[in-house]
Each structure stands twice: as C-alpha cells, then as structure tokens.
From Swiss-Prot:
Binds to laminin. The modification Sulfotyrosine is found at residues 20-21, 23, 30. Cornea and other tissues. Contains keratan sulfate. One of its GO terms (biological process) is positive regulation of transforming growth factor beta1 production. The modification Phosphoserine is found at residue 304. The modification Pyrrolidone carboxylic acid is found at residue 19. This is Lumican.
Length: 338
C-alpha cells in the first residue's frame, strides 16, 4: 500500500476529458463502394458511407446523397435545418452537428424523427435553449452539451436511448424530473455543470453512471440512491454537501464502484459499501477517519475493496489515521493524504 501526499492541483483519477466525442468508424464499412459526395465535403474511400463536412464555414446543411450513414458537420456556421434536409438519407445513423449556431426555432418540423435508423445525435456547443425533438425510437446516444438548455421536452417512446449528455447547460431539477422518467434503457446520464439545488426526482432506475458534479446540491433525500440497483459510477463533487444533508447510508450501495464527493463541506466520511473501489473525498472538512465508514467488522474475509482513496485537502494527516485502517483497506493501492 502506498500512502502518498499529492498537490491539491492534482487532476482527478479517471478524468473524462473528451469522453463524449466518440467518432470511430465501424470496421464493417471498409471495402464498400463510396457513394456520391457533396462537392464541398469529403467522402473517403476508406469510409465509404461517411461524409465529412467539418470546418467549411457552412451556413446550411449541404446536399447529402443517398447511401450516407455517418454525417459530420462540425465547426461550421449552420444556424438552421430545413425539414427536408435529410430526405435523401433515411439510413443515416450518426449525425454530428457540434460547434454550430443552431437555435431551436430554426430546426424545422420532424427533421430528426424521420431518420428511422438514427443512433447518434450530437448537437454540442450550439445555441439551444431546450432539447430537440421529436426524436426517432432508434436513438441510442444524445449529446446536447454546452448549450443554454433550461427546458427538456418529452423523451417518450425512446426505448433505445442509453446515453444522455447534458452537462454545461442551465437545467434545474424540476426540468429534469419531468422528462426522463420513462427511459427504461438509460444507463449513462451526465447533468454536471448545471443549476440544480436538489437531486431530480424520477430518474430512471436503469442508470449505471450518474454525474451530478458542479451543481448546488446540498441535500440527499433518505434512500434516494437505493432504487438504482445497478449504479456503478456516481459523481457529486463541487456541490454544497454537508453532514447534515447526507443521511447515514446514502451511499451504501452494493453495486457502486466509484464515488466522487470531493470539494464539498463534509466533516465525516459517509459510509460506503465494502465493494466500492474508488473513493474521492479531497478538499472537504474531514476531521477524523472512522474505519466503520468502510468496514462494519474486521476479519480475514471482511475488508474493503477500496483501491484508490483521496483524502488530501482535509485536516486529516497521515499520523492521525488509525492503525486498523490498514487492515480494513488491505487491498488499497493508493491512499492520498496531506
């Protein structure tokens, strides 16, 4: 076991920088005949069903020929989408519109719901004030980050929607609670960097990953997370959590592998399940280390599975850690203190 001291500026382990830009082309596309291509765009023979129209200062969607399944329109000046923009490409599967000037009022009609094969829709870094729609039932991955969204429309019927990225918007908890209830396939939800003061009610119980960092959340309702029976990754860093707002067993979730409570106002370590592997508590107000927060009892077969534990930026020091901590955290690779 390593007991180390790190600078407070150390980046979080498991940074997700760039995590929502996954544009790899499936291998099965190799060897196909390239379709016709819009003259201003690029349709390489190595990716015959992909059309790249990035960084062209386009102000509207170009002509998209039949056969295109993967359409990239990033870093342009597109400020509207006509209802007939994709009539020739009913087999379109990926539509990437990041870094444009789109507003909701200029996205016409049912332009997206007509795309019955659409799986990925990315409209990050635009000027949206609410979610787009209606959307096709085929959709699996919706990314609307870095907009000005304060309202979510209906997601009814999106039975395949698995990933939703909504970070860096202006969402409050009521807007979220009313919209996501029926998404039974949803596994990944990122609501970080919004304006929530409470945890939203009615989130789908199918979630495996939930990011709520960089909000203004100060209270965890009793047994709020208990219904998420498969939850594995939970981030609540950079909120306003204090001991008074965190019931005793809030995070005692047997499925949880990673919990981030860093940059809050906690004075004691919230109890976690022995299955937790990564626990981030840096920059709180922790005054003591209670072994019972990790191990209810100690024995040959009773110990915590913690691998990484961050405690730096707290009043705790290495000398204040109790000796039985090492027996409880016997498989830890790294414990960071001041």
């Amino acid at each position: 076991m390593n007991v180390c001291a790190f600078s407070l500026a150390l980046a979080l382990v498991g940074s997700v920088s760039g995590q929502y830009y996954d544009y790899d082309i499936p291998l099965f596309m190799y060897g196909q005949i390239s379709p016709n291509c819009a003259p201003e765009c690029n349709c390489p023979h190595s990716y015959p069903t992909a059309m790249y129209c990035d960084d062209l200062k386009l102000k509207s969607v170009p002509m998209v020929p039949p056969g295109i399944k993967y359409l990239y329109l990033r870093n342009n000046q597109i400020d509207h989408i006509d209802e007939k923009a994709f009539e020739n490409v009913t087999d379109l599967q990926w539509l990437i519109l990041d870094h444009n000037l789109l507003e909701n009022s200029k996205i016409k009609g049912k332009v997206f719901s007509k795309l019955k094969q659409l799986k990925k829709l990315h409209i990050n870094y635009n000027n949206l004030t609410e979610s787009v729609g209606p959307l096709p039932k085929s959709l699996q991955d919706l990314q609307l980050t870095n907009n000005k969204i304060s309202k979510l429309g209906s997601f009814d019927g999106l039975v395949n929607l698995t990933f939703i990225y909504l970070q860096h918007n202006q969402l409050k908890e009521d807007a979220v609670s009313a919209s996501l209830k029926g998404l039974k396939s949803l596994e990944y939800l990122d609501l970080s960097f919004n304006q929530m003061s409470k945890l939203p009610a009615g989130l789908p119980t199918s979630l495996l990953t939930l990011y709520l960092d960089n909000n203004k959340i100060s209270n965890i309702p009793d047994e709020y997370f208990k219904r998420f029976t498969g939850l594995q990754y939970l981030r609540l860093s950079h909120n306003e959590l204090a001991d008074s707002g965190v019931p005793g067993n809030s995070f005692n979730i047997s499925s949880l592998l990673e919990l981030d409570l860093s940059y809050n106002k906690l004075k004691s370590i919230p109890t976690v399940n022995e299955n937790l592997e990564n626990y981030y508590l840096e920059v709180n107000e922790l005054e003591k280390f209670d072994v019972k927060s990790f191990c209810k009892i100690l024995g040959p077969l009773s110990y915590s599975k913690i691998k990484h534990l961050r405690l730096d930026g707290n009043p705790l020091t290495q000398s204040s850690l109790p000796p039985d901590m090492y027996e409880c955290l016997r498989v830890a690779n790294e414990i960071t203190v001041n």
